[in-house]
C-alpha cells in the first residue's frame, strides 16, 4: 500500500527510495524555472504538504513546487482558503482550493494523481506534480490504480493514479505505523488501525525494530506494533 505522507517527504529530500520501501529513486529535482530546486507548479497542483506531528504537534512542511504569477505557497498550518485539511495532514495550493476537490472520495474514485518527469537517457529526476481529486477519510490510505508511462521528447513521463482504501484493523504481529525521524523532520507512516483497547505508540523506545537509511538527510525509522 502506497503511503502518501512519507512519499512526499523523501521526494522533497531528493530521494524517494525510502526506509519504508517506496520503489522510486531520484536525485534532487532540478528545474531552472523554479526556485530551491523545485519545478514551477502546474495549474491546480499542490504546492506543499504539511503533517502535524503526533508527538509534539510540530508541523513539518514539505514544498513540492514553486508558485508563479505572484502567488505564494504557505508553509504554515492555517485555513487561508488555499489549504485543504485532512486530519493531521494539510495540502497547500498556490490559489484557492479547486471546487472540484471539495467532496469525499467514492470507493472507486480516483483520489490522487502523481506525475513524475525524468530524463529518458540518464533517468535523472526532473519534476514532480501532485493533484488531489477528492478528500480521503483520515483512516484511509492511497492504493495505486494504474501507472501509465509515455515519452515526450527527451523526457519520460510517468503518471500514477490512486484511490482511497480504508486502513485494515491490525493483527497481533502487524506493524501499525512507522515513525521516520531525520533532522527536524518527523513523519508517521500509518499501516493499520489498532483494535479497541490498544494504541500505536509514538515513543521511539517502544519500537520492535529500527531501520537506518541515508538520503540527503539521515533517517531512522522506528517500527511499531499495537500495545
UniProtKB/Swiss-Prot annotation:
GO terms for molecular function: toxin activity. Residues 1-21 form the signal peptide. Expressed by the venom gland. It is found in: Secreted. The keyword S-adenosyl-L-methionine does not apply. Disulfide bonds: none annotated. Keywords: Disulfide bond, Secreted, Signal, Toxin. It comes from the Eukaryota. Gene3D superfamilies: 2.20.20.160. Belongs to the scoloptoxin-11 family. This is U-scoloptoxin(11)-Sm6a.
Amino acid at each position: 500500500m502506497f503511503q502518501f505522507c512519507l512519499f512526499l517527504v523523501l521526494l522533497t529530500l531528493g530521494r524517494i527510495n525510502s526506509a519504508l520501501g517506496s520503489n522510486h529513486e531520484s536525485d534532487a529535482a532540478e528545474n531552472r524555472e523554479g526556485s530551491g530546486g523545485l519545478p514551477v507548479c502546474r495549474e491546480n497542483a499542490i504546492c506543499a504538504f504539511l503533517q502535524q506531528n503526533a508527538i509534539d504537534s510540530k508541523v513539518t512542511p514539505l514544498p513540492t513546487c514553486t508558485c508563479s504569477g505572484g502567488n505564494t505557497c504557505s508553509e504554515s498550518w492555517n485555513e487561508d482558503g488555499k489549504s485543504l485539511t485532512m486530519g493531521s495532514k494539510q495540502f497547500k495550493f498556490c490559489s484557492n482550493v479547486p471546487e472540484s476537490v471539495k467532496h469525499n472520495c467514492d470507493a472507486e474514485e480516483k483520489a490522487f494523481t502523481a506525475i513524475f518527469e525524468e530524463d529518458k537517457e540518464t533517468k535523472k529526476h526532473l519534476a514532480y506534480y501532485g493533484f488531489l481529486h477528492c478528500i480521503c477519510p483520515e483512516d484511509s490510505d492511497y492504493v495505486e490504480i494504474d501507472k501509465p508511462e509515455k515519452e515526450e521528447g527527451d523526457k519520460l513521463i510517468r503518471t500514477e493514479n490512486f484511490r482511497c482504501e480504508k486502513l485494515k484493523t491490525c493483527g497481533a504481529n502487524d506493524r501499525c505505523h512507522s515513525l521516520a525521524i531525520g533532522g527536524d523532520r518527523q513523519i508517521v507512516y500509518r499501516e493499520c488501525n489498532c483494535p479497541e483497547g490498544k494504541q500505536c505508540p509514538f515513543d521511539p523506545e517502544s519500537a520492535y525494530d529500527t531501520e537506518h537509511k541515508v538520503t540527503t538527510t539521515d533517517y531512522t525509522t522506528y517500527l511499531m506494533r499495537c500495545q
